[in-house]
Swiss-Prot record:
It comes from Capsicum chinense (Scotch bonnet). This is Unknown protein 3.
Length: 8
């Protein structure tokens, strides 16, 4: 449910 994609 995140607007921005961050590397996790």
């Amino acid at each position: 449910g995140e607007v921005f994609a961050f590397p996790r």
